């Protein structure tokens, strides 16, 4: 179905005219103006339904729909602007995987934890777990999707380890509580539904969680953990 066919009569009118007065003027004929000799009076009669050549639309209905349509358009523009991966020509599977998950992570529909192991600009081997949704909100991913910089773990991420200096850091994020004292290995508790994410490759990742190894030419080792919250809101 064409988009215009799905619009109501009010929607058609609202999208056609910038203001309610413009709509009223479109309903006034030259004959009306000739006899009434008052444009303001002619508008009032159209608004009351006594004059006019088409659909009767109340001022409050027009203005309410106009506001709703403007809000929807602004939200769409904001969403397109927010998705930094939109319109990018991505060749590496890792960047493609991040792009596929960007919108849902921003919207809170999905929570992705990124494990990366590789060498930093100093040649040191580092690894860590990144809260993708948190990073999306706290920094601009344009440089990563454009290939100008590589996404690497930081000491401010949920987990960071430098294999050369043996520096190890753990931090809870807005979305996850880090459980570092577990004898079987590192665990992350998702704060919204309190489900445990187990990143041990030999263990099941947990309820509503999926482990996805990624083949990439950009890093030595990449694994994504997708968690879908089932908490009722």
UniProtKB/Swiss-Prot annotation:
Abundantly expressed in testis, specifically in spermatogonia and primary spermatocytes but not in secondary spermatocytes and spermatids. It holds the Pfam family DUF4464. It is found in: Cytoplasm; Nucleus. Its main location: cytoplasm. InterPro entries: DUF4464 (IPR027887). GO terms for cellular component: cytoplasm; nucleus. Keywords: Cytoplasm, Nucleus. May be involved in spermatogenesis. This is Cilia- and flagella-associated protein 299.
């Amino acid at each position: 179905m064409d988009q215009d066919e799905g619009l109501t009569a009010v929607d058609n009118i609202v999208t056609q005219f910038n203001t309610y007065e413009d709509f009223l003027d479109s309903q006034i004929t030259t004959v009306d103006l000739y006899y009434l000799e008052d444009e303001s009076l002619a508008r009032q009669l159209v608004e009351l339904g006594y004059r006019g050549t088409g659909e009767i639309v109340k001022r409050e209905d027009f203005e309410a729909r106009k506001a709703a349509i403007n809000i929807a358009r602004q939200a769409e523009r904001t969403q397109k602007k927010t998705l930094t991966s939109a319109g990018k020509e991505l060749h590496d599977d890792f960047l493609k995987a991040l792009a596929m998950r960007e919108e849902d992570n921003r919207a809170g529909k999905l929570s992705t934890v990124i494990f990366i192991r590789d060498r930093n600009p100093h040649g040191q081997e580092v690894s860590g777990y990144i809260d993708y949704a948190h990073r999306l909100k706290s920094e601009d991913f344009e440089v990563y999707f454009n290939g100008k910089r590589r996404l690497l773990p930081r000491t401010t991420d949920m987990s960071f380890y430098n294999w050369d200096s043996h520096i190890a850091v753990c931090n809870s994020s807005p979305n996850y509580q880090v459980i570092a004292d577990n004898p079987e290995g590192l665990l992350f508790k998702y704060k919204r539904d309190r489900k445990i994410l187990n990143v041990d490759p030999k263990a099941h990742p947990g309820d509503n969680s999926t482990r996805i190894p990624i083949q990439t030419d950009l890093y030595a080792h990449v694994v994504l953990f997708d968690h879908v919250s089932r908490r009722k809101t």
